[in-house]
């Protein structure tokens, strides 16, 4: 089984995914980290040198390589579900979990976060607000195809993990060890 965590940048996919994997006794991977290790470049460097299209193609390669893995929690890049047929592929190959946050919380996290995110790097507060609201609106068409949606607003990592595990229990009413 594969669990794919999807959602906008800053939604907690990596943090929650790592915790969920530990709770399940599964492996955890972050697709951005895999790309960075494979290329020897940070995500901002990839965007600068190769552009977003190249990055999205690399994401798809990584996704395809992960489909053969089992008992794994996968934190995807925020845009991964929105390109090619990635979302459909993830839904066929496992359980997709959308970590939903309202734009204002995403904006706050991005403004005060310590991760260099190339799509928002040089935006002033107004530009950031506009970017998040417009991009989230476009991406939610894909995010809303997830099998499970968790409102992660005001949730600790532990409580968000518990919500996911509870939703998995409901999804697998035979209680398959979650």
What are these regions (language model features)?
Residues 5:
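Hydrophobic anchor at the beta1->P-loop junction of P-loop NTPases
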Residues 8:
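P-loop (Walker A) phosphate-binding loop of NTP-binding proteins
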Residues 11:
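ATP-binding Walker
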Residues 14:
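Walker A/P-loop
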Residues 19, 23, 137-178:
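NTP-dependent small-molecule kinase module
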Residues 22-33:
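Post-Walker A helix-loop "phosphate-sensing" segment adjacent to the P-loop in P-loop NTPases
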Residues 31-91, 116-118:
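ATP-dependent small-molecule kinase phosphotransfer cores
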Residues 92-140:
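A glycine- and Lys/Arg-enriched "phosphate-lid" helix/loop adjacent to the NTP-binding pocket
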């Amino acid at each position: 089984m594969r669990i794919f965590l999807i959602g906008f940048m800053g939604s907690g996919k990596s943090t929650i995914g790592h915790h969920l994997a530990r709770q399940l006794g599964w492996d955890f991977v972050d697709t951005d980290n895999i790309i960075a290790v494979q290329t020897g470049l940070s995500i901002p460097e990839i965007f600068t040198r190769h552009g977003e299209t190249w990055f999205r193609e690399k994401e798809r390669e990584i996704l395809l390589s992960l489909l053969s893995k089992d008992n794994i929690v996968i934190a995807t890049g925020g845009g991964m579900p929105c390109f090619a047929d990635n979302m459909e592929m993830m839904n066929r190959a496992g359980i997709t979990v959308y970590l939903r946050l309202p734009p204002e919380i995403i904006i706050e996290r991005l403004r005060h976060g310590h991760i260099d995110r190339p799509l928002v790097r040089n935006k002033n507060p107004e530009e950031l607000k506009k970017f998040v609201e417009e991009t989230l609106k476009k991406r939610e068409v894909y995010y809303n195809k997830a099998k499970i949606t968790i409102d992660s607003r005001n949730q600790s990592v532990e409580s968000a993990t518990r919500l996911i595990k509870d939703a998995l229990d409901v999804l697998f009413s035979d209680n398959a060890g979650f």
